[in-house]
C-alpha cells in the first residue's frame, strides 16, 4: 500500500486526514512541522506528501523547496493543503515544487480522491 506523509501542525487536521486515508487502505505518517517533514520524507521516501504551509519553524514553502532540491525526494509529489488561498500563495507554492494546491477546508472525500488521482497517474 502507498505511504502518504502528512505535514501539518494541527493534530486535529492530521487525525482527520489519517483516518480518511487509512480507511481507503493507505499507510500514513505525520510530521508537525516542515523540518520534521523533510527528515521523515528523506528517511521514509513516501509515495505522496500533503503539506501545510503555516507551521512553526520551517514552513511548508521552505520544506517543499528543500524536498524538491534533494535528489532522493525530488520526485515525490507534494500537494499543499492549507488555509492560504490567495492566487499569489498558490503560485508561490507551485513554484517551490508542489504539483497541486488545495485550500482548507478540504473534505475527507476530496482528500482521498486527490490521493487516488495523484497516485494512479
Regions found by a protein language model. Give the residues of each.
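Charged docking surfaces used in two-component/phosphorelay signaling
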Residues: 15-23
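Short hydrophobic/Thr-rich beta-strand motif most characteristic of the beta2 strand and flanking loop
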Residues: 25-32, 40
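Active-site beta3 strand of CheY-like receiver
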Residues: 44-50
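Receiver (REC) domain active-site loop signature in two-component systems and cognate sites
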Residues: 55
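Short, glycine/charged-rich "phosphate-handling" switch motifs in NTP-dependent
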Residues: 99
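C-terminal output helix
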Residues: 106-116
Amino acid at each position: 500500500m502507498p505511504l502518504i506523509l502528512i505535514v501539518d501542525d494541527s493534530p486535529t487536521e492530521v487525525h482527520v486526514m489519517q483516518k480518511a486515508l487509512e480507511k481507503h487502505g493507505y499507510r500514513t505518517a505525520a510530521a508537525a512541522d516542515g523540518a520534521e517533514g523533510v527528515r521523515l520524507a528523506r528517511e521514509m521516501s513516501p509515495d505522496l506528501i500533503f503539506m501545510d504551509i503555516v507551521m512553526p519553524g520551517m514552513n511548508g514553502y521552505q520544506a517543499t523547496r528543500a524536498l524538491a532540491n534533494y535528489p532522493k525526494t525530488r520526485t515525490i509529489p507534494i500537494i499543499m493543503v492549507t488555509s492560504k488561498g490567495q492566487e499569489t500563495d498558490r503560485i508561490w507554492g507551485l513554484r517551490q515544487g508542489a504539483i497541486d494546491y488545495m485550500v482548507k477546508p478540504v473534505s475527507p472525500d476530496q482528500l482521498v480522491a486527490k490521493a487516488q488521482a495523484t497516485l494512479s497517474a
